[in-house]
Amino acid sequence: HFKAVDANGAVIGEQFWTDGEMLGHEGAIGHLSGFLRTHSGGHRLVGVGHRVVHGGLLYAAPARLDAAVVSDLEQFIPLAPLHQPHNLAPIKLLMAQQPDLPQVACFDTAFHRTQPELAQMFALPVELHEAGVRRYGFHGLSYEYIASRLQSIDPQAAAGRTVVLHLGNGASMC
């Protein structure tokens, strides 16, 4: 299901596909590109941002994507095998189709990298921590957004300790 709304919330495009019909990454990007061409009002796409689940120890902030960064991110597939390949597929596809289009990755693990190193450690031998075994934390983009908005939504909660739950296909607590 594809749905696009304007700044006022009015639906400007919607498409349903039959049950079980799968576009795949290439089909989805093709549909989105076609929609943007017909609804851009003369504007052009100047960049693409991606949510990427795992930045490992290498990426604790958004990163401009190039072949070297994508190669780095591929090494984290074993740490997030259900997500990372699907995060990287549209990046690679767009790199092949539009190599001059800037792309940026924002990492779900980055928010938790701001914790003290001790909080990232498991109660395991230090050699394992030094080899990269740690609490990476997930759903960080969601938590980062909530942390940035909490003061304006609930100043009293923002002034103290707050527990936030991320519940969906995956679940976490921060």
Where in this protein do the model-derived segments appear?
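N-terminal phosphate-binding loop and adjacent alpha-helix
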Residues: 2-41, 69-80
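Short, hinge-like loop/turn segments at secondary-structure boundaries
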Residues: 8, 66, 121-124
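Electropositive phosphate-/nucleotide-binding environments in soluble metabolic enzymes
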Residues: 22-26, 30, 42, 63, ...
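Short beta-strand-loop/turn "lid" adjacent to the catalytic site in phosphate-handling enzymes
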Residues: 36-83, 102-104, 111-119
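Phosphate-binding/catalytic loop of phosphoryl-transfer enzymes
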Residues: 84-174
